[in-house]
């Protein structure tokens, strides 16, 4: 039986410990390390023999998506399996764009999570069926990278001037990007546009 060495990265200590305890019950899975954020996960994956990195998509600092990009870019054999509490369809496409091998939600039963790890380790792709359906229905992210940047800043309550200073754009350019994003999301204002984009995992 091949041993699968797993790294768990989640900013919630209880979640990490719970996942580790459940996975350690599997005869072929060994949790070799735990990380509290994406940066720690990247460092551990670079220094330890890790077959599968189980990464929470939303962590402070370096996100699970960014950590996945770095782990994959390092050229190691580690495969990344994204885990999230949010079934936002846009996350699925972004995860695969980052180089992830799979995507599951956190309430996946332990036996199914273990099976997902085995499949990813074997070189297969794993996707939560409900999330895959939502992703197909939602379609691709309609926002340009710059519109995403502008909406991200707007979601924190920044004015057009403040957004412009943060992104080195003129206030007029910011307003144009906001107007375009509002149109694409079918909303009435920047607050609604940011909320819709966040809900769909486009930011």
Task: List each model region and its residues.
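Active-site residues of response regulator receiver
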Residues: 10, 56
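Acidic, metal-coordinating helix/loop segments flanking the phosphotransfer/catalytic sites
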Residues: 34-52
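Acidic catalytic/metal-coordinating carboxylates
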Residues: 37-40, 60-66
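Short amphipathic alpha-helix used as the core "switch/output" element in two-component signaling
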Residues: 43, 65-77
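Short, conserved "switch-loop" micro-motifs in signal-transduction and mechanochemical regulators
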Residues: 86-87, 172
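Short, flexible helix-to-coil linker/hinge segments that flank and couple to helix-turn-helix
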Residues: 90-97, 101-149, 202
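Recognition helix of helix-turn-helix DNA-binding domains
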Residues: 159-192
